[in-house]
Design a protein with these regions (language model features):
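Short beta-strand edge/turn micro-motifs at domain boundaries
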Residues: 47-50, 54-88, 215-219
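Flexible, glycine-rich surface segments
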Residues: 106-204
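Surface-exposed beta-loop interaction hotspot
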Residues: 80-115, 122
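Surface-exposed, charged secondary-structure patches
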Residues: 12-59, 153-160, 165-173, 178-187
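Stable alpha-helical elements in mature extracytoplasmic
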Residues: 4, 22-25, 58, 92-95, ...
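Short, well-ordered alpha-helical segments enriched in acidic and aromatic residues
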Residues: 1-11, 117-120
Length: 255
């Protein structure tokens, strides 16, 4: 701790909370350092420490000041925030695609022995049933459609900094127009979901949505993201929503 304070300053815990550091991450960093390490210049007065063959850079820049070189903690915190948002948003895109795949798989079988194929109206099944996309399985049993993905849930119900909700209908801006996905109390006419950041600007910025069409849309809902998402009951990617090109490709524009 004394060494950390000498190197990073009194606020070292903000960038290196020792009680939260994963031992495996430390080992990976040491191996990368032993493979290769260098300083990458960003102008004349700033350098970044890079390690490994891929030159992963420590988010804490080393800058030149009046008394010499030092780690710039404020800029480092901002770089860490940007990286965290990027990681969470990429994870959310993959998670919402996994939701799409899970719903398609779920509807391939009659999950409640009523002779009908349907989509799941909830993510986690009621104990002892298969009415959701995830359920506990015993050793040797097939995984549920969402499988081990649910193992990374946070205690508050989020996943990689995002909340999720299943939507049971769509609005006028969706392909096919407005209609409910419910036939009776079963969701058989389609499915959709929306994901939004738990802490806007910190855990994420963009919100994401997908339906049975398989096109992932994104939108920056702004500072009122939590309120807007709480009021969202329909899949309706209208003004302000655009396809995620990295996932969907140009063909999504015509859907």
């Amino acid at each position: 701790k004394t060494m950390m304070r000498q190197i990073l300053g009194e606020d070292y815990r903000e960038v290196l909370p020792l009680d939260e550091v994963d031992g495996e991450d430390v080992d990976n960093y040491i191996r990368a350092w032993e493979t290769a390490h260098s300083l990458l210049a960003e102008g004349d007065n700033k350098k970044l420490l890079a390690v490994g063959k891929g030159q992963w850079t420590l988010p804490l820049p080393i800058v030149r000041g009046d008394t010499g070189w030092y780690f710039d903690i404020p800029e480092g915190l901002e770089r860490m925030r940007i990286r965290r948002i990027g990681r969470n948003e990429l994870a959310t895109i993959q998670a919402i695609l996994a939701y799409y795949d899970a719903q398609m798989e779920y509807a391939e079988q009659d999950r409640n022995d009523d002779g009908l194929l349907e989509y799941a109206r909830q993510v986690v099944s009621t104990p002892g049933t298969h009415d959701g996309l995830y359920w506990d399985v015993a050793e040797g049993e097939p995984e549920s459609p969402l499988g081990p993905l649910m193992g990374d849930r946070t205690p508050g119900g989020g996943y990689h900094g995002y909340y999720y909700r299943i939507l049971e209908g769509q609005g006028e801006d969706a392909r096919g127009g407005a209609y409910s996905y419910l036939i009776g109390y079963r969701m058989r006419a389609g499915f959709a979901a929306v994901a939004w950041p738990i802490d806007y600007g910190e855990s994420g910025v963009m919100s994401f949505t997908v339906s049975h069409d398989g096109v992932v849309y994104e939108s920056n809902l702004g500072e009122d993201t939590a309120t807007i998402a709480a009021d969202m009951t329909l899949y309706n990617p209208g003004a302000g929503w655009s396809p995620v090109q990295e996932v969907n490709g140009p063909q999504a524009d015509s859907r």
